[in-house]
Amino acid sequence: MAAPAKGMWCSLGSLLRVVQTRDLNARRWVRALRRSPVRVLSPSGQVEERKRAPDQQPRKAVPKASSQGQRQKQPLETSPSQTPHTWEEAGLRYDKAFPGDRRLSSVMTIVKSRPFREKQGKILLEGRRLIADALKAGAVPKAFFFSRLEYVKELPVDKLKDVSLIKVKFEDIKDWSDLVTPQGIMGIFAKPDPVKMTYPETPLHHTLPLVLICDNLRDPGNLGTILRSAAGAGCSKVLLTKGCVDAWEPKVLRAGMGAHFQVPIVNNVEWETVPNHLPPDTRVYVADNCGHYAQVQMSDKTGDRDWACDRRFLKFHKYEEDLDTKTRKDWLPKLEVQSYDLDWTGAPAAVVIGGETHGVSLESLQLAESTGGKRLLIPVVPGVDSLNSAMAASILLFEGKRQLRIKVEDLSRDRSYH
């Protein structure tokens, strides 16, 4: 009996402990749910105020007006730095950018986008030399962002009248610059009009009766190099047909090395209006560096070989869907092929340079046929697809310059004999 009694008392003890634990937890929950009233209304009508515990004291709300007032005061603290500083040496005034100034970023957003550039009529020029060349050619400046005042002092003072001068940190210029080593000055100019520009007299003295037509050139580096070659050869004008990369894109400007302000450039020209930009009696020649002509250039039996080169020569992705091979062969303009080193400068000439991706357009061949022009062959060795567009343009332009120089020398020699 002792053992069962002992087991019964142990079970009863454990049960009591469980009941006590549950009762303790219940009391804790009840204590947590109890709330002390803030005010007590007695039957007599008296109100008794109860004091809150320290942890129950209400927090003071921060008034919104004070935070707004602090926000409104922040620009006022930086307003003294917006006061224009006077440049006493030339009587010009410049602004010093204040923290959070967005004038530079807003302008850069416009001039670095082609649609915005064309809509706003503004371009970006970077570097002291390029800016000086633009001012010398008659470009109209709108604003200059610079990190040191000495950079502005190097520019012609008479060209800086009514121009916004804003001094910014060099880090801000570096963030927006396309150069590896920024020069600390950026200029915003109105998009130049070739009719109103005053180009340097020395290049004009050596100008040739030679016009360059760029057809669907899309690589900025190639176009900048071509413009540089055109300025060096002495072209009278450069026409960029619709579809070419913008001549005023920063990469083209960087590759051009100032050629934009040494030769007139007409941008975004429709093929229907190209003859309006050419001198009277101009013959249009098309650059042809297709290797298939290297062996048949002087032969009269071009036939199928002409067509083999034409398929790579033209951008037929727009036309070949609805035409079979025979129809296209009859439809193509018939142009005579001539070696580039033979005389082709007897009359005013225009040279068409096509892009490397699609070649020249059908419109260029039709214009060449209507003006009595030819294909100028640059022979390359078998296995080589073609030359770089900038290289082909340089070869033809300087060959034309050589031929014209020989004509001038022969003419002066004949006059000396008489």
Swiss-Prot record:
Annotated positions binding S-adenosyl-L-methionine: 354, 378, 387
Subcellular location per the Swiss-Prot or TrEMBL entry: Mitochondrion
InterPro entries referenced in this protein's UniProt entry, alphabetically: Alpha/beta_knot_MTases, MRM3-like_sub_bind, Ribosomal_eL30-like_sf, rRNA_Methyltransferase, SpoU_MeTrfase, SpoU_subst-bd, tRNA_m1G_MTases_N
Top-level taxon: Eukaryota
E.C. number: 2.1.1.-
Assigned keywords, A-Z: Methyltransferase, Mitochondrion, rRNA processing, S-adenosyl-L-methionine, Transferase, Transit peptide
Keyword rRNA processing belongs to the record: yes
Alphabetized SMART domains for the sequence: SpoU_sub_bind
Biological role: S-adenosyl-L-methionine-dependent 2'-O-ribose methyltransferase that catalyzes the formation of 2'-O-methylguanosine at position 1370 (Gm1370) in the 16S mitochondrial large subunit ribosomal RNA (mtLSU rRNA), a conserved modification in the peptidyl transferase domain of the mtLSU rRNA. Also required for formation of 2'-O-methyluridine at position 1369 (Um1369) mediated by MRM2.
Protein name stated in the entry: rRNA methyltransferase 3, mitochondrial
Record organism: Mus musculus
Gene this protein is translated from: Mrm3
